[in-house]
A protein has these predicted regions:
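Short, flexible loop/turn elements at secondary-structure junctions
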Residues: 19-23, 52, 76, 105, ...
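Active-site-proximal helices and loops of the catalytic beta/alpha 8
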Residues: 171-264, 269, 297, 316-350, ...
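Substrate-binding/active-site clefts of carbohydrate-active enzymes
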Residues: 2-32, 36-44, 50-162, 183-192, ...
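Short, surface-exposed connector motifs at secondary-structure boundaries
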Residues: 162-169
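Carbohydrate-interacting/catalytic domains
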Residues: 1-47, 53, 86, 90-91, ...
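Active-site clefts of carbohydrate-active enzymes
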Residues: 263-286
Length: 436
């Protein structure tokens, strides 16, 4: 984490919007009527996937990838005007939320404004042609940060956007010099204090591949010099391995706790079950009870929580990144009541500053998690396989109320019957507390 990172980011929820597919209209204006609902889900920050004009050369699909940007300082005319975006940002601010935009500084579209004006700022293949270092990204060309003038231009762009927005989610931040990000953070702070910096840090395997090819690649530890939050991709492969039965629950939880020992004491991770690069969690989980357990477990983990637009409907369909594919807001299940209860838990001081532990039950796929802060305890019990189990819980015997559904549970001789639903208890020392 950067030295001035605010720990309260661990209490916060980011809601991600892809403007093209959030509404049938696919415009900035069409989002405004939905803001109150999003606020009700507990969103503190709304992150907009790239809002800029999209290149036409080598475009993927009909509409193109929003990550193949033509002009960093303009907005996509299909979404509206700059004034429309400013009005949207103002409406978000009026509701007490912050605005975050995507910053895609590793590359541009092949027909970008910078390609036309400054071709010398781009990576060249051995044959002298512009290109990219990741073959499947054929609709983009990589920037070359050995040019100081490029740094100046990019930082000036960020400073301009900082007059409108409150945060930056930086795409494949690991592939851009960390020294650039450090300088950018410092200079942007002179325009607006408290800007939130989120790094899309990458999977270790992708990092190794780039380093093996002689390209730069920065780890999460290095990125924390400039960023407040990094992605959970350092443990994502383990999450997937557990999900598909390749490793034990204990192995997975050990890796999650390993983060607590290798990062600074006030590190912040972005916790999520899905995003635009990965399948919807519902496409992997048919059982809604199991889905609820995984959802609550994601909220419980230490860090900022990401909700990907539409996740609240428990839909299995991931909107197409390259085409018009609006979210169907009438999903199979409305998770809104659950998410509304979870936001109250997420605000707890113990989640921000307490000690944190995760244990695997001995004979079931159940997680027992606990935060301790002073004499306060927040205990979570999650049946990741969706099955009821009897588990040992480190709490005094007695009756506890589940903060998620107000049902009472008896702990007797240190054991509890889970009933297969996610559970959150709050207690103070030996005294039990039945309401948040």
């Amino acid at each position: 984490m950067a030295k001035d990172t605010f720990l309260n980011l661990r209490n916060q929820i980011i809601y991600c919007i892809y403007v093209r597919n959030h509404t049938p209209e696919g415009t900035f204006k069409a989002i405004i009527p939905d803001l109150q609902r999003i606020k009700g889900l507990g969103a503190d920050i709304i992150w907009f996937m790239p809002i800029h004009p999209i290149g036409e050369t080598k475009r993927k699909g009909v509409e193109g990838s929003p990550y193949a940007i033509k002009d960093y300082r303009a907005v996509n005319p299909a979404y509206g005007t700059m004034d429309d975006f400013k009005a949207l940002a103002a409406a978000i601010h009026d509701l007490g939320m912050k605005v975050m935009i995507d910053v895609v500084y590793n590359h541009t579209s092949p027909d970008s404004q910078l390609v036309e004006q400054h071709p010398e700022w781009f990576y060249r293949r051995p044959n002298g042609e512009m290109g990219n270092k990741v073959g499947e990204w054929y609709d983009i060309v990589d920037l070359d940060y050995s040019h100081p003038e490029l740094w100046d231009y990019q930082i000036e762009t960020l400073k301009q956007w900082a007059t409108i927005v409150d945060g930056f989610r930086c795409d494949v931040a690991s592939l851009v010099p960390v020294e650039f990000w450090v300088r950018a953070r410092k200079e942007v702070a002179e325009v607006k204090a408290g800007v939130v910096w989120l790094a899309e840090s990458v999977h270790p395997s992708f990092l190794r591949m780039n380093r093996d090819r002689g390209n730069i690649g920065y780890s999460d530890s290095e990125l924390y010099e400039a960023f407040d939050i990094t992605y959970l991709y350092d443990v994502h492969d383990f999450q997937q391995a557990y999900f598909w039965g390749e490793i034990s629950l204990k192995n997975y939880l050990d890796v999650l706790l390993f983060q607590d020992g290798i990062y600074p004491v006030n590190y912040v991770k972005l916790r999520f079950l899905e995003n635009h690069d990965h399948p919807r969690i519902r496409s992997k989980i048919d059982d809604i009870g199991r889905l609820r357990n995984w959802t609550v477990f994601a909220y419980f983990q230490k860090g900022t929580l990401l909700l990907f637009g539409g996740q609240e409907t428990a839909t299995a369909h991931l909107p197409d990144l390259f085409e018009k594919d609006p979210i169907a807001w009438t999903g199979e299940e409305d998770l809104t009541p659950l998410l509304q209860r979870l936001q109250r838990f997420k605000r707890e001081a113990a989640v921000r500053e307490g000690s944190y532990d995760l244990k695997a039950a001995s004979e079931s796929e159940t997680v027992i998690g606990q935060y301790r802060f002073g004499n306060e305890r927040l205990t979570g019990i999650f049946c990741l396989d969706g099955k009821a189990a009897k588990v040992a819980v480190d709490l005094p015997d007695g009756v506890y109320r589940n903060q998620l559904d107000d049902q009472e549970y008896q702990i007797s001789e240190g054991l509890l019957e889970t009933r297969s639903v996610p559970i959150l208890f709050k207690s103070y020392g030996e005294a039990l507390l039945t309401e948040v």
